[in-house]
């Protein structure tokens, strides 16, 4: 497992539970022991986290079900209609920026 994935696995649960952009977590999901964070549903593997980003040309929320079928451990979305089995945040783009900053800071402290 690459070092950045190991760091994400070690610190994700603490990060998400204190994240200011968090709206809701499905209590049934296990926030530990995943492979990686993935934004491309075509590349999802079993036990990955799918981050449903939306842009000008696509809406990642349209691919939540596909990512589940491919075996994602859970997903992160800003669409309240997809909360079962996932994490609801204010903005998935801001979440991606914030988790990246968090991991950079954790890496500096090591």
Model-identified regions with their sequence ranges:
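Walker A (P-loop) phosphate-binding motif
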Residues: 100-110
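N-terminal leader/targeting and accessory segments in enzymes
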Residues: 1-98, 102
């Amino acid at each position: 497992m690459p070092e950045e994935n190991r760091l994400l696995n070690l610190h994700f649960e603490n990060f998400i539970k204190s994240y200011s952009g968090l709206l809701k977590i499905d209590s049934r999901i296990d926030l530990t022991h995943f492979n990686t964070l993935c934004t491309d549903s075509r590349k999802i593997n079993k036990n990955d986290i799918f981050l449903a980003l939306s842009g000008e040309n696509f809406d990642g929320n349209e691919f939540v079900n596909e990512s589940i079928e491919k075996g994602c451990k859970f997903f992160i979305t800003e669409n309240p209609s997809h909360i079962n089995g996932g994490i609801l945040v204010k903005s998935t783009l801001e979440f991606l920026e914030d988790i990246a900053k968090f991991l950079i800071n954790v890496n500096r402290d090591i």
